[in-house]
C-alpha cells in the first residue's frame, strides 16, 4: 500500500511539473507571438521547432521523403501525369489543366504554362500535395500547371533535383504544345525549396539561351548563408536549426566553406540583369 501511495504521489507531482513546464513554455513564446499578425496566429506556432538540433529534422525527414498524397480540390481541372526525358535526364510530372473557358484563356487554343516546383526544404513533399493550390492557379489564370517530381536531398543531394526539374522545364519549352500549352508564355514558380529551385532553373535557362517569361517566388530558400535573426523571425515552424540542417543535407556539411556550383544557392548570383 505504501509503495502504491508513493507511486501515485510521484505520478501526480510529475503531472503537476509537466503542466507547470508547459505553461511556462507557452508564456515564454508570447512575446514572439505578438509579432505575428493576428490572423496568422495558430497553436501550431507553439511547437518547439526552434529547440531542434540542426540535423534532427533533416535526418528524420528521410522517413517521409517519398510520401506524396493528393488532397481535395474545389476547382474544375483535369489532372494527369506523364513521364519523359530531356537531354538524358528522366523526370515525371503532374499536369493540371483547366476545363472550359476561364478568365485567362478561351475554351480552346494554347494556354500559358506554369512549371511549379513544390516546397519541403529539399527534404519532403510532392506535387500531389499541392493539388488545391495548383488547381486554383490553373483555374484562375487559365494556365496549364506542370508540377515535376524530384529527388529529395536525403535520397540524392544537389544537383539531382535541379537536373530533373530543368529537364521538365526544357521539355515543356520544346514540347508544351502537346499539352495544349503556349510555349511562348512559360513561367516558373515555387515555394520554399521549390522557390529556390525555380530561381536556379530560370537562371540556368537564361544562361543557356532559353529564357522564360516570368518567375514566381513564394517564401523561397534562396541563400545557403542565411543566419539567425532577432525577434520572432526564425522562431516558428521553419526555424534556424532545421534551416541549417536542410542546407547541409542538400549541399554538404562544408557548404559554407567551399565554392558552390552554379544555381545551388541562387542568391549568390551577382548579376541578375535580363532575368524576369
Regions found by a protein language model. Name each.
Residues 11-32, 52, 80-82, 89-276:
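Alpha/beta-hydrolase superfamily serine-hydrolase fold, recognizing
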Residues 70-82:
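A domain-start/cap signature at the N-terminus of enzymes
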Residues 66, 84-86:
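Short linear interaction segments
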Residues 1-71:
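N-terminal targeting or regulatory segments adjacent to alpha/beta-hydrolase or S9 domains
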Amino acid at each position: 500500500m505504501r509503495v502504491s501511495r508513493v507511486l501515485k504521489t510521484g505520478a501526480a507531482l510529475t503531472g503537476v511539473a509537466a503542466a507547470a513546464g508547459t505553461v511556462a513554455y507557452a508564456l515564454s513564446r508570447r512575446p514572439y507571438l505578438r509579432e505575428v499578425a493576428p490572423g496568422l496566429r495558430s497553436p501550431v506556432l507553439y511547437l518547439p521547432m526552434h529547440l531542434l538540433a540542426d540535423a534532427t529534422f533533416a535526418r528524420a525527414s528521410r522517413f517521409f521523403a517519398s510520401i506524396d498524397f493528393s488532397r481535395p480540390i474545389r476547382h474544375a481541372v483535369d489532372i494527369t501525369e506523364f513521364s519523359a526525358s530531356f537531354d538524358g535526364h528522366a523526370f515525371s510530372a503532374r499536369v493540371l489543366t483547366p476545363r472550359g473557358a476561364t478568365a485567362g484563356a478561351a475554351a480552346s487554343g494554347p494556354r500559358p504554362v506554369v512549371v511549379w516546383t513544390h516546397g519541403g526544404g529539399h527534404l519532403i513533399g510532392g506535387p500531389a500535395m499541392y493539388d488545391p493550390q495548383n488547381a486554383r492557379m490553373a483555374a484562375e489564370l487559365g494556365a496549364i500547371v506542370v508540377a515535376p517530381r524530384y529527388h529529395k536531398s536525403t535520397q540524392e543531394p544537389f544537383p539531382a533535383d535541379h537536373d530533373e526539374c530543368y529537364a521538365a522545364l526544357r521539355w515543356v519549352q520544346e514540347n508544351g504544345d502537346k499539352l495544349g500549352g503556349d510555349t511562348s508564355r512559360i513561367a516558373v514558380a515555387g515555394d520554399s525549396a521549390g522557390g529556390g529551385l525555380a530561381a536556379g532553373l530560370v537562371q540556368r535557362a537564361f544562361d543557356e539561351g532559353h529564357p522564360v517569361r516570368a518567375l514566381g517566388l513564394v517564401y523561397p530558400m534562396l541563400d545557403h548563408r542565411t543566419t539567425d535573426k532577432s525577434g520572432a523571425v526564425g522562431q516558428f515552424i521553419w526555424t534556424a536549426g532545421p534551416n541549417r540542417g536542410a542546407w547541409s543535407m542538400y549541399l554538404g556539411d562544408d557548404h559554407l566553406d567551399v565554392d558552390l556550383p552554379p544555381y545551388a544557392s541562387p542568391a549568390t548570383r551577382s548579376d541578375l540583369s535580363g532575368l524576369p
